[in-house]
Amino acid sequence: MTTDEEQHTKTHVDIVIVGGGPVGLLAANLAVKYGLSVRIVDIEFEPQHWGRGDWIHGRTLELLDHSGLATDLLATGARVETFSHHHQQVSSSVAYAPEHVVTKYKHLLCVGQHITESSLQHSLSEHDVQVERPWTVSQFQKDGRDSKYPLSVTLKNMLDASTCDIRAKYLLGCDGAHSDIRKQLDIAYEGESSKKNHGVLDALVHTSFHDRKSISFIKGPFGTHACMFPRENNLVRVMVQLSDEGDRNQIHLETVQHEARRALLPHRVEFTAVMWWTIYAVGQHVATHYTSSQEDPRIFLCGDACHSQSPTLGQGLNTGFGDVFNLVWKIAMVESGHAKASLLNTYEMERHPVAQQVIAMDKQIVQAVESKEQENLETLLRQYQLFISGFGISYRNNENNVMIQTGDRAPDFKVVHYATGSKVRLYDIWRKQVEETNMRWGFHLLVLAHDITQSMDAVIKGFKDFTVPLWMRVHIITTTVQKGVIEKQLSQQDDIDPAWIYMDKINQAQCHHGLIPEYNNNSNGNNDPVAIVVRPDLHIGWIGDFSKLSLGFIA
């Protein structure tokens, strides 16, 4: 029996995923990495070969890298580090990521969605999972017949109309802005669409326009505006506003090319080969709910199925990926028995506000791009710099202007490993440990121990009071940098593994300074250890005195 035949015979699976685009493929990849069984279906006869979302932001790259899914994309895409704005003879630029963000990825990656999908499908194939085409979910219900697999799901083949019934624990609707899963759940998709038509094309271009390495927003001499940026294999994507608000099906490629040339005047532009083009109208929508039930959530919406916006800042793909990174580890943790089902309610609680922020920002950016005032766009790009790149996305419960708090992205600081003396990033430590363990969704516990000669007793007591679960990895970070001093402290106890110890000796103890707002070279004499719990999606799950840590941070 072939792999495809074996897949089609699976009548009981953990997750059914509807939609074989990048969001659905990422969900399937994470699920199988976490030990969950999946079937993924797509209504289309074949995958997309060109077009659609092509920006992968810095924060998304961090998460893909952490999951072992970034290598092929990084080798292929075009790296962009600046936004630029051009109007007649005046040009200006804004850095993609703020200088203070500590990360390997201070750039976005411009790469075709078909390449992203191909990379994710290749990784998924290593787990003997393929997208089943052209299949869809024609109906589903929680019927109470099987407590372990509570969902009855009917799959329908769009080629011959044949059907098959399977049982599942969860259903993920990753089926786009026109989501049939969302419609079957009768969840409203609130928002508005513009009547203004825009053209977009991917092409090989010869041009005298000088800025070929940035995301370039261009205001032409006749009021036409365009956006142009590099892609993989010397391709260029051009997006341009069209003057025609009529039937977009009547707009031809020549019109898009003509308006792009007008926007770029007086520069010469020649489209030598157009690989893909389309016409779109800006729509900004958010689903009122992301799940069917708060009592026992089993059906979830992800990606464009629960939010859509303009392609101006490439937020769609990245927001969808953020949904999946937030959700799948929670499902895995619940299914492993380490968390209550109520943890799944936090998916909508955390991700719905993010989509609302994306829409609010998108409306302002679109208006600024179409405005005659150059300063408006520059101001907004600087204002939303952290959010656009994804580094500023947070699940905070409040708006207090505290340096670091629960819900924020965990910083990727550099430390020195005590045992090996090697300099290493926190994210690289965590990725390596994820690769070496079967507990792929594991948490990480950072204990900031200050001067370990003063705090060792408190650190040991903390570990006696808090039993570290198997799904949590420990890292003790100390400002003590003399290996001999640390060795002496470790020799006097048996509770702490030397492999846990890292020295905060880079940039004057950047971990302590960056993660403990009140830290200032211990001038206040406080050496109480601070605990920081980092979730599988690399957000901070809890921060506070180590002596107060418990597993209560899990919903």
Locate the predicted segments by residue.
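Helical substrate-recognition/capping region of FAD-dependent monooxygenase/halogenase enzymes
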Residues: T2-D14, V18, K33-Y34, H87-V90, ...
